[in-house]
Amino acid sequence: MSIQHFQRKLGITKYSIVTNSNDSVTLRLMTEHDLAMLYEWLNRSHIVEWWGGEEARPTLADVQEQYLPSVLAQESVTPYIAMLNGEPIGYAQSYVALGSGDGWWEEETDPGVRGIDQLLANASQLGKGLGTKLVRALVELLFNDPEVTKIQTDPSPSNLRAIRCYEKAGFERQGTVTTPDGPAVYMVQTRQAFERTRRFA
């Protein structure tokens, strides 16, 4: 069962992690109407740097081709829009690592492992803790599915901001791996670690 099917089966369309009344980060499922906005985001310089590079700047048609199948639940990637006080501030996605294809996680054997990626749309909001809140919200949402055993991610070794963000959200470095995008820092959060953190929070 995909995360998206699991969410819709239970009627889950949004998850929020509330830190105070003026700083609530929420996640909602992305829709087809968000594709033009995502296209504009993916062409912003601070995102291009870590999301494909200058040579991979997408056209609107590229974004529609790549992301519409996820929106329509035709593949195992689940796309979200992150919201702050009712305004869209970023994109996140989760996917089943096993069988993800294109050279990704080919040695994975656990169907309960999920991969995640995310971005903040506005450069002015970097370094203010919003990325950590977004990741925490996504992690808790995914672990609401009892079938999920571990969440993993793979920031570039040069993306120190992302690495710090993941560490603050409870991820641990497990070394460097080679991915289709090049070297990456392999970072994980297990269900056991997540539940242990919640018990002592």
Curated annotation (Swiss-Prot):
Q: How does it assemble?
A: Homodimer.
Gene source species? Serratia marcescens
| Entry annotated with the keyword Transferase | yes
**Record-level Gene Ontology MF annotations:** aminoglycoside 6'-N-acetyltransferase activity
Top-level enzyme category: transferase
Chain coiled-coil ranges: none
| Keywords carried by this UniProt record | Acyltransferase, Antibiotic resistance, Plasmid, Transferase
The answer, when asked if Acyltransferase is one of the entry's keywords, is yes
Q: What is its EC number?
A: 2.3.1.82
Q: Which CDD domains match?
A: NAT_SF
Q: Which protein, by its recorded name, is this?
A: Aminoglycoside N(6')-acetyltransferase type 1
Q: What does this protein do?
A: Catalyzes the transfer of an acetyl group from acetyl-CoA to the 6'-amino group of aminoglycoside molecules conferring resistance to antibiotics containing the purpurosamine ring including amikacin and kanamycin.
Q: Which reaction does it catalyse?
A: kanamycin B + acetyl-CoA = N(6')-acetylkanamycin B + CoA + H(+)
Q: Name one GO biological process term.
A: response to antibiotic
Please list the residue ranges annotated as the N-acetyltransferase domain. Answer: 25-192
Q: Which residues bind acetyl-CoA?
A: N159
Where along this sequence does the record place binding of substrate? W51, D154
